[in-house]
A protein has these predicted regions:
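Short helix/turn-capping signatures at newly exposed starts of structured segments
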Residues: 1, 7-132, 195, 200-214
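A charged, solvent-exposed segment within the mature domains of Sec-exported extracytoplasmic proteins
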Residues: 17, 126-202
Length: 214
């Protein structure tokens, strides 16, 4: 069981998340490949650079989501890889007053979708949990477990605050609606600040969604 403790109005609030024993061993990746990190949060990398990267990978653009101000908000690509089957990019917008203008059009975060979820997560009921094998690979690459909020397992790296939000689910536009593992990649400089509950809430607020669930 995972327990988070928070003081609120002179009272102690406990948050309980049931953790389960892994049912068996699962194979995982031979190495940790987090995709186009070089495109992430870079002021000199814009939508055209993402398009060029995906063209070089022979990917197919599936959908493009526009904002109310008619800016490109997100793009979904289908890859030709049978395991890493899709990537979705989310971009900083000119219309967002909180965004420095030099970042507008740059990649704020991206999500990787895997057709074999058990390479990193396993399912218990309606919940997905990171496998011991994938956790070992993540920690070997200097990622620390930040916490679990019932939906996302969050890991982050102290050296540069690269943050991963790992989840499982079914999406209408990905893998023909079959279950996938989703890893959302972003930078969050304050990811280790505050209580565990506060850290998870900050990451959750940042996460973008593009593909509706089935």
């Amino acid at each position: 069981m995972d327990v988070d403790i928070r003081e609120e109005n002179n009272s102690v609030v406990l948050f309980f998340y049931q953790m389960h024993t892994q049912d068996r061993s699962y194979p995982t990746f031979s190495s940790l490949d987090l995709g186009p990190v070089a495109l992430l949060n870079k002021t000199d990398k814009k939508i055209s650079d993402v398009e060029a990267y995906e063209t070089g990978k022979n990917s197919e653009e599936m959908k493009r989501q526009m904002s109310k101000s008619n800016e490109v908000e997100a793009i979904l690509y289908k890859t030709n890889d049978p395991t890493l089957i899709a990537r979705t990019y989310f971009f900083y917008l000119h219309s967002d007053a909180a965004v420095p203008q030099e970042k507008a059009g740059s990649v704020e975060q991206y999500s990787l979708f895997y057709s074999q979820p058990n390479l990193g997560i396993w399912q218990y009921g309606n919940e997905w949990f990171v496998t011991h094998e994938f956790d070992k690979l993540l920690t070997a690459n200097n990622f620390e477990f930040v916490g679990y909020n019932g939906k996302h397992h969050v890991y982050a790296r102290r050296s540069d605050y690269l943050t991963l939000a790992i989840s499982g689910g079914e999406y209408a536009d990905v893998n023909n609606g079959k279950a996938v593992m989703q890893i959302t990649v972003l930078y969050k400089p304050t990811v280790f600040a505050g209580s565990k509950e506060q850290r998870l809430a900050k990451v959750e607020r940042m996460l973008k969604q593009y593909n509706p669930k089935k």
